[in-house]
Amino acid sequence: MPLTVKCPICKAPVEWVPQSAFKPFCSERCKLIDLGDWASEKHVIPVKAEFDPEAFDEFDLDEGDFFKE
């Protein structure tokens, strides 16, 4: 008996077999809805922001230095 999972979008049952063209989704519609959610940033992968202010020190120029020749 094949494994059955729920479609992440509509919760319909999906058999996890090679013939399931859209797995883990039940249909192309649900697959495209999920793609749209990623594209519109409704889904994001959490990443710890690592801001290193020293990495930008080389770009810190005094305004007077900017226009010197």
Curated annotation (Swiss-Prot):
Keywords: Metal-binding, Zinc. Zn(2+) binds at residues 7, 10, 26, 30. InterPro entries: DNA_gyrase_inhibitor_YacG, Znf_NHR/GATA. Pfam families: YacG. Its cofactor is Zn(2+). One of its GO terms (molecular function) is DNA topoisomerase type II (double strand cut, ATP-hydrolyzing) inhibitor activity. One of its GO terms (biological process) is regulation of DNA-templated transcription. Belongs to the DNA gyrase inhibitor YacG family. This is DNA gyrase inhibitor YacG.
